């Protein structure tokens, strides 16, 4: 089944990318996108940011006002600041609760769309061969392993194919990361070398 073959490979790529980037990073990016949408949560986020700016501004005005020379003005600013801070904390708690609900929903959806879907496919298509091997191409013992646990003899099961995809994706991903690190290393070395030379020249001038 070519479509199943590609689906399993694609799922393994997605799982590797999420694990490499980090689930928390992915959740954070999705949250930033979510609060840009026209929803009630985005309205709460905008109000929270506005209240935060107001609190910071009032605090700055309080710092610029002498509590001794301009006590009446300072006291008025203090009352406004305390009231704004209380409103900000209430709105921030509301946004925090919304984010907790969002994070829980995203975690469930992410697991269902990746690892959960993979488990479902492995169970549902456990008897379905991914592809058939040429007759007599490999010993029957190897054929039995490749068809494990329930695929017909002489075929490759979805479990074996999924494991092979995960291994290859991990190897390719690690190779790409190593290549990027190798390419970027000379630039970093040149920067360090330039900084060292500047330091030596500065000492000579002194």
From Swiss-Prot:
Per the UniProt topology annotation, the Cytoplasmic ranges are: 25-110, 173-206
Q: Does the keyword Transport apply?
A: yes
Coiled coil (UniProt feature): 75-100
Q: Where in the cell is it found?
A: Endoplasmic reticulum membrane
**Membrane topology type:** Multi-pass membrane protein
Any single GO BP term: tail-anchored membrane protein insertion into ER membrane
Example of a GO MF term? protein-membrane adaptor activity
**Keyword annotations for this protein?**
Coiled coil, Endoplasmic reticulum, Membrane, Transmembrane, Transmembrane helix, Transport
Source species, domain of life: Eukaryota
> Principal localization?
endoplasmic reticulum
InterPro entries reported in the protein's UniProt record:
Get1, Get1_fungi, Helix_hairpin_bin_sf
Can you tell me where the transmembrane regions are?
5-24, 111-131, 156-172
Q: Which residues lie on this side of the membrane: Lumenal?
A: 1-4, 132-155
Its Gene Ontology cellular component terms are: endoplasmic reticulum membrane; GET complex
In terms of PANTHER family, this protein maps to: GUIDED ENTRY OF TAIL-ANCHORED PROTEINS FACTOR 1, TAIL-ANCHORED PROTEIN INSERTION RECEPTOR WRB
Q: What does this protein do?
A: Required for the post-translational delivery of tail-anchored (TA) proteins to the endoplasmic reticulum. Acts as a membrane receptor for soluble GET3, which recognizes and selectively binds the transmembrane domain of TA proteins in the cytosol.
Task: Provide the assembly information.
Answer: Interacts with GET3.
Similarity comment text for this entry: Belongs to the WRB/GET1 family.
UniProt-recorded name of the protein: Protein GET1
Q: Which organism is it from?
A: Ajellomyces capsulatus (strain G186AR / H82 / ATCC MYA-2454 / RMSCC 2432)
């Amino acid at each position: 089944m070519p479509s199943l073959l590609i689906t399993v490979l694609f799922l393994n790529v997605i799982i590797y990318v999420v694990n490499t980037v980090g689930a928390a990073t992915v959740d954070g990016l999705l949250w930033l996108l979510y609060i840009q949408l026209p929803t009630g949560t985005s309205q709460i986020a905008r109000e929270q940011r506005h209240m935060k700016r107001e609190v910071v501004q009032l605090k700055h005005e309080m710092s610029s006002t002498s509590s001794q020379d301009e006590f009446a003005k300072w006291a008025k600013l203090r009352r406004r600041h305390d009231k704004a801070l209380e409103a900000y904390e209430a709105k921030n708690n509301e946004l925090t609760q919304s984010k907790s609900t969002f994070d829980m929903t995203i975690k469930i959806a992410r697991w269902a769309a990746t690892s959960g879907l993979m488990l479902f496919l492995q169970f549902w298509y456990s008897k379905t061969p991914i592809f058939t091997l040429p007759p007599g191409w490999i010993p029957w013992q190897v054929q039995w392993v490749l068809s494990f646990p329930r695929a017909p003899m002489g075929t490759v099961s979805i479990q074996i194919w999924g494991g092979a995809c995960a291994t290859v994706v991990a190897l390719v991903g690690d190779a790409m990361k190593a290549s990027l690190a190798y390419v970027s290393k000379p630039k970093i070395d040149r920067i360090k070398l330039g900084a060292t030379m500047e330091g030596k020249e500065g000492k000579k001038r002194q």
